[in-house]
């Protein structure tokens, strides 16, 4: 076994991030766990993450483009983890908000649907909306001064997390 910090993050992290859009198990599970563990292992050396942010945007965009609620939830969990690993990641994501937040806006505006007498099983849309709201707040808090304007441009119904203070 090779220690994770010895891996080439610029090579492996985008590959595993691209695997998030897989719907078949065990591939989806392996990709999800690999991304989480690689990001967790980089906590001591944040430069690794800041160097790979640009190469992660395309796999994130492709995964969000599937519009599968489970995949979207996995991606926003990873986005939150990326923002928490190092304060410098937030400002690096701002130029890419146009590619990422458009799909999140579709889910953010969908608070639920009328099913009549039927029941819906699985991930509830409201749960996904709450997770997206938390992600947008974290992106605003870690993104700096221009983050709110960039988020508001892509998600017009978003209200500032700082307005509640």
Task: Label the predicted regions.
Residues 1-30, 151-165:
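N-terminal "cap/leader" segments of large eukaryotic alpha-helical scaffolds
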Residues 108-128:
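Acidic, Ser/Thr- and Gly/Pro-rich intrinsically disordered linkers and low-complexity segments
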């Amino acid at each position: 076994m090779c220690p994770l910090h010895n891996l080439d993050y610029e090579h492996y992290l985008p590959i595993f991030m691209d695997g998030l859009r897989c719907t078949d198990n065990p591939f989806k599970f392996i990709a999800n766990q690999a991304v989480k563990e690689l990001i967790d292992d980089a906590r001591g050396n944040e430069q690794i993450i800041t160097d790979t942010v640009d190469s992660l945007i395309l796999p994130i965009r492709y995964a969000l483009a599937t519009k599968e609620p489970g995949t979207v939830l996995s991606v926003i969990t990873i986005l939150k983890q990326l923002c928490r690993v190092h304060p410098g990641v937030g400002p690096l994501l701002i130029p890419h908000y146009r590619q990422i937040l458009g799909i999140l806006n579709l889910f953010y505006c969908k608070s639920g649907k009328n099913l009549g007498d039927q029941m819906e099983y699985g991930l509830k849309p409201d749960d996904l909306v709450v997770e997206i709201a938390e992600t947008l707040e974290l992106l605003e808090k870690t993104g700096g001064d221009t983050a709110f304007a960039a988020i508001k441009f892509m998600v017009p119904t978003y209200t500032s997390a700082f307005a509640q203070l």
